[in-house]
Amino acid sequence: MNQWEELQESVGFDFKDVELLKQAFTHSSYVNEHRRENVKDNERLEFLGDAVLELTVSDYLFNKYPDMAEGHMTKMRAAIVCEPSLVEFAEAVHFSKYVRLGKGEEKAGGRTRPALLADVFESFIGALYLDNGIDKVVTFLERVIFPKIDAGAYLQTVDYKTQLQEIVQRDRDVLIEYDILGETGPAHNKAFDAQVIVNGQVLGKGSGRTKKQAEQSAAQFAINQLTHR
């Protein structure tokens, strides 16, 4: 059994177009180092998967919470599809082992980079939608995401920057700073990278579609670091 057969068995779906599945796990760095193979990276699938994920999660929340206000549903959805959550979902189904990376990206630790894993999860959703349809996407989410919603994991949506400030300032006054490290992607699909620094020490890094989302993501990773020490 090769890795792609193993992956299909793991997720519980057979792909009619296995090349589409491979593309979902192909980082641009791999494409740059294998130009003769005529392979495609996963960026377009990520774009599609992002939209499919938002739609399916929105539909689930809409039906599960018929009396919930729009603003609260929006916050819940944002917490579900944010980078740290997507990384958690990707790790739960062991997606990192299947990612195709260039040698340089591999050496730089790309296989465990949060933004990369989040992108792979979205690109897989895009590929699954194209190959198997929306119903199979929902079936997959019923295994990976919806049980966490049912368990109430996202009912208390949190301002992570405020929570981090409360955690680190319990015992003493500290200086918390956020830096935007850069931005990537085309104008219609930009991603920003941010880090949070507490008293001169980098505690978390994250990325998001906006600078505010990137800072929230960095704060969430910092909280995870502090609470799992």
Swiss-Prot record:
<protein>
    <recommendedName>
        <fullName>Ribonuclease 3</fullName>
        <ecNumber>3.1.26.3</ecNumber>
    </recommendedName>
</protein>
<feature type="binding site">
    <location>
        <position position="46"/>
    </location>
    <ligand>
        <name>Mg(2+)</name>
    </ligand>
</feature>
<dbReference type="GO" id="GO:0010468">
    <property type="term" value="P:regulation of gene expression"/>
</dbReference>
<comment type="function">
    <text>Digests double-stranded RNA. Involved in the processing of primary rRNA transcript to yield the immediate precursors to the large and small rRNAs (23S and 16S). Processes some mRNAs, and tRNAs when they are encoded in the rRNA operon. Processes pre-crRNA and tracrRNA of type II CRISPR loci if present in the organism.</text>
</comment>
<dbReference type="InterPro" id="IPR014720">
    <property type="entry name" value="dsRBD_dom"/>
</dbReference>
<comment type="similarity">
    <text>Belongs to the ribonuclease III family.</text>
</comment>
<dbReference type="GO" id="GO:0019843">
    <property type="term" value="F:rRNA binding"/>
</dbReference>
<feature type="active site">
    <location>
        <position position="50"/>
    </location>
</feature>
<keyword id="KW-0963">Cytoplasm</keyword>
<feature type="domain" description="RNase III">
    <location>
        <begin position="4"/>
        <end position="133"/>
    </location>
</feature>
<keyword id="KW-0698">rRNA processing</keyword>
<dbReference type="InterPro" id="IPR000999">
    <property type="entry name" value="RNase_III_dom"/>
</dbReference>
<keyword id="KW-0460">Magnesium</keyword>
<dbReference type="GO" id="GO:0004525">
    <property type="term" value="F:ribonuclease III activity"/>
</dbReference>
<dbReference type="GO" id="GO:0006397">
    <property type="term" value="P:mRNA processing"/>
</dbReference>
<dbReference type="InterPro" id="IPR011907">
    <property type="entry name" value="RNase_III"/>
</dbReference>
<feature type="active site">
    <location>
        <position position="122"/>
    </location>
</feature>
<feature type="binding site">
    <location>
        <position position="119"/>
    </location>
    <ligand>
        <name>Mg(2+)</name>
    </ligand>
</feature>
<keyword id="KW-0507">mRNA processing</keyword>
<dbReference type="InterPro" id="IPR036389">
    <property type="entry name" value="RNase_III_sf"/>
</dbReference>
<feature type="binding site">
    <location>
        <position position="122"/>
    </location>
    <ligand>
        <name>Mg(2+)</name>
    </ligand>
</feature>
<comment type="subunit">
    <text>Homodimer.</text>
</comment>
<dbReference type="GO" id="GO:0006364">
    <property type="term" value="P:rRNA processing"/>
</dbReference>
<dbReference type="GO" id="GO:0005737">
    <property type="term" value="C:cytoplasm"/>
</dbReference>
<feature type="domain" description="DRBM">
    <location>
        <begin position="159"/>
        <end position="228"/>
    </location>
</feature>
<keyword id="KW-0699">rRNA-binding</keyword>
<dbReference type="GO" id="GO:0008033">
    <property type="term" value="P:tRNA processing"/>
</dbReference>
<keyword id="KW-0255">Endonuclease</keyword>
<keyword id="KW-0819">tRNA processing</keyword>
<keyword id="KW-0378">Hydrolase</keyword>
<keyword id="KW-0694">RNA-binding</keyword>
<dbReference type="Pfam" id="PF00035">
    <property type="entry name" value="dsrm"/>
</dbReference>
<dbReference type="Pfam" id="PF14622">
    <property type="entry name" value="Ribonucleas_3_3"/>
</dbReference>
<dbReference type="GO" id="GO:0003725">
    <property type="term" value="F:double-stranded RNA binding"/>
</dbReference>
<keyword id="KW-0540">Nuclease</keyword>
<dbReference type="GO" id="GO:0046872">
    <property type="term" value="F:metal ion binding"/>
</dbReference>
<keyword id="KW-0479">Metal-binding</keyword>
